[in-house]
């Protein structure tokens, strides 16, 4: 196995699941365990100025090998895994020379199949890493960490490769939208950066959703069912009414590309009280604002129907479409496209991110930061997998991008 695979498997063994129901950063202390390991590894391979903050951010510098008046470039990946599916203990499976058929996931009844995921046929003859059906794999985004780490090691061991100063960073809590809450942009010291947090080999992204979180509190009134007529107010049924008043087909399972949605992530309740958690997403700022306005209209309607205060909400913007901040710096995509071409991808696939990245918020904080592929697929669930050859190519991509930046003139 190559080093990038060894590194990934090691990182995947750490339980780093974030938690969306806390108000601290990082949301889970266990993320510190991987952060400490990464800090030590960076130091061991010779990265300079390595540090770990008390908020679980790991930073480091790869010194320049040439004197050039070029921008400082950064590469970032996140340590946490999604709270939407179990991630511990992770037991990866390696499938060598994939034959194009079904892959049984461990001792479970689950099968990773091209009948469900036709693009698996693209990987015939290559080597895949899957989960075992009990947990997610964690390629999102421990593959990105492994690729950045091996890039750093390779460049330090090959000082003959010309490049400017390179910054690396690993962040917590990206999966819950708080990945850069306490990220030190000024201290990081990069002029531009890339997150390595994407999907299939040959893809890159610079458009994200505009995003908001929505928490809905429905207050009912419980009365014995035998004497409930004209008295009971069932919060569960009102909550269902709320959800039914949102567009039925503006949901994740019915949308793709630039189509936005409302997503009911979870719901808990009884007659007296019900709580629903949503995310709201759209690439268009105008439609995004219209979605939030619709929520307020539904709340007003239900409160008029059932009594003021029956439905209360907390709605907060999470991040915005980073395209606005990337468009003035499209040379970032041009450089990546040149690197892809040298690696056999004449036209990289550029699609909108149907989610967010740390780069979305960093771009609005003055660090333009598009997203690069890792080689993974089917994130946040048991069918997650990654191609080993894609990981190896991504390392080559990062090295080439780093080299190309030496020829960019710093403004």
Where do the model's predicted regions map?
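His/Asp/Glu-rich mid-to-C-terminal helical/loop segments that flank catalytic regions of hydrolases
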Residues: 233-252, 286-298, 338, 343, ...
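Short glycine-rich, acidic/polar surface loops and turns
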Residues: 261-267, 352-370
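N-terminal capping segment at the start of a domain
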Residues: 2-29, 129-130, 222, 319, ...
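A non-catalytic alpha/beta surface segment that caps or lines the substrate-entry region
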Residues: 23-70, 74-76, 80, 90-95
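Active-site metal-coordination/substrate-binding segment of hydrolases
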Residues: 68-165, 170
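Flexible, glycine/charged-enriched surface loops at secondary-structure junctions
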Residues: 20, 49, 160-165, 248-263, ...
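Short, low-order "capping/linker" segments at domain edges
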Residues: 321-339, 365
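Midchain, well-structured core segments that form catalytic/ion-binding scaffolds
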Residues: 120, 126-139, 173-296, 300, ...
């Amino acid at each position: 196995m190559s080093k990038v695979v060894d590194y990934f498997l090691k990182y995947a063994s750490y339980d780093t699941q974030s938690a969306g129901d806390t108000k601290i950063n990082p949301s889970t202390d266990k993320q510190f365990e991987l952060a400490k390991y990464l800090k030590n590894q960076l130091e061991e391979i010779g990265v300079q100025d390595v540090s770990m903050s008390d908020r679980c951010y790991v930073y480091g510098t790869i010194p320049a090998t040439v004197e050039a008046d070029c921008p400082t470039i950064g590469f970032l990946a996140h340590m946490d895994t999604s709270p939407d599916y179990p991630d511990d203990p992770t037991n990866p499976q390696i499938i060598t020379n994939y034959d194009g058929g079904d892959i049984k996931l461990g001792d479970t009844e689950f099968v990773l199949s091209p009948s469900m995921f036709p693009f698996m046929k693209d990987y015939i003859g290559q080597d895949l890493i899957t989960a075992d059906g009990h947990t997610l794999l964690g390629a999102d985004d421990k593959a990105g960490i492994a690729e950045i780490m091996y890039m750093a090691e390779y460049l330090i061991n090959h000082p003959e490769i010309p490049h400017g100063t390179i910054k690396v960073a690993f962040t917590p809590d990206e999966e819950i939208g708080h990945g850069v809450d306490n990220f030190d942009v000024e201290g990081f010291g990069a002029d531009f950066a890339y997150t390595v947090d994407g999907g299939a080999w040959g893809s890159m992204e610079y458009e994200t959703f505009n995003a908001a979180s929505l928490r809905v509190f429905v207050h009912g009134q419980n009365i014995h069912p035998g004497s409930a007529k004209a008295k009971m107010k069932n919060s569960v049924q009102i909550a269902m009414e709320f959800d039914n008043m949102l567009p039925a087909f503006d949901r994740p399972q019915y949308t793709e590309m630039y189509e936005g949605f409302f997503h009911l992530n979870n719901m808990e309740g009884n007659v007296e009280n019900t709580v629903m958690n949503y995310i709201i997403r759209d690439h268009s700022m105008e439609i995004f604002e219209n979605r939030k306005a619709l929520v307020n209209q539904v709340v007003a309607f239900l409160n008029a129907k059932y009594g003021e205060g029956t439905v209360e909400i907390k709605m907060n913007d999470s991040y915005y479409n980073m395209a606005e901040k990337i468009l003035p710096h499209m040379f970032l995509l041009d450089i990546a496209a040149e690197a892809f071409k040298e690696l056999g991808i004449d036209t990289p696939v550029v699609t909108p991110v149907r989610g967010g990245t740390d780069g979305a918020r960093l771009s609005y904080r003055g660090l333009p930061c598009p997203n690069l592929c890792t080689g993974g697929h089917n994130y946040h669930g048991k069918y997650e997998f990654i191609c080993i050859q894609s990981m190896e190519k991504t390392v080559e991509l990062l090295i080439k991008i780093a080299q190309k930046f030496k020829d960019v003139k710093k403004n």
